């Protein structure tokens, strides 16, 4: 019985490492991406990286508790983020139409990209194992196109706090 408990504990510790193993790390060049936004427009990483600091965040699903809290939190911080030349882009497997409804309902003021095939999610290593859903992970991409900070937490508040601290470091 003790051996099975130990094996279960070890296995549970290895799963997160395996899930995030292919995720870009601080200092890596951010993977190029392109996706359709809520208005049906094609958005490419080359359109924003180099012009803005990019806060690229992945989240599980529109209209769910934590995802709504996170989106509204970025919305409410947009004034400060814009002053710091930060462009927020959210990514999930949801459709562009669903993103449009989500934006309308919560008055969101930033871009959401539809990633129905998971190409962006997979490029950033954020897919939930075996699912068409992303883990809650945020990447801060500097003007040079390199990853400056990565936050992996189910708690949206941690994303706000860590991203703001990383943005403040860039400004110094």
Tell what function each PLM region has.
Residues 3-32:
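N-proximal helix/coil linker or "cap" segments that precede and/or mark the start of modular domains
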